[in-house]
Amino acid sequence: MLVPTRVKHRKQHRGRMHGKATRGNTITFGEYGLVALEPAWITNRQIEAARIAMTRYIKRGGKVWIKIFPDKPITAKPAETRMGSGKGSPEYWVAVVKPGRVMFELAGVPEEIAKEALRLAMHKLPVKCKIVRREELEGGDANEN
């Protein structure tokens, strides 16, 4: 599973997700991509589940790129703990995803197989997504809905 090896600060503020993705909104490696249409936190387990779903479907052919990395720690306090006494310990890691962000890329397989693999990955993620081809993103703005 994806987790940072070292972090400068063990705990982070929650933060807010404003606007669209300005970085990571183009297909750089593959031919097909999975683009987020709404903001969300995507956990390292969800990323791994989507990756496994794609790689199992495309079998030995093709290549998958994961374009998001869970670098934000989410803390939680134990169950039945009284309020106060500080912030909880880090429980899991999330990737902050804004609309327009390309999360996964795929290449080296026919179009039908690529679309089905990305569709399977889409069902593992907590956001609405769309499947795009490299030409579609280069032609116009990917953030336009």
Swiss-Prot record:
Keyword flag Hydrolase? no
**Swiss-Prot/TrEMBL keywords:** Ribonucleoprotein, Ribosomal protein, RNA-binding, rRNA-binding, tRNA-binding
Gene Ontology cellular component annotations, sorted alphabetically: cytosolic large ribosomal subunit
Q: Which PROSITE patterns match?
A: RIBOSOMAL_L16_1, RIBOSOMAL_L16_2
Q: Which GO terms describe its biological process?
A: translation
- Has UniProt tagged this entry with the keyword RNA-binding? yes
Coiled coil: which residue ranges?
none
Which parts of the sequence are annotated with region: Disordered? 1-22
Q: Where is the composition biased (Basic residues)?
A: 1-21
Family per record: Belongs to the universal ribosomal protein uL16 family.
This protein's name? Large ribosomal subunit protein uL16
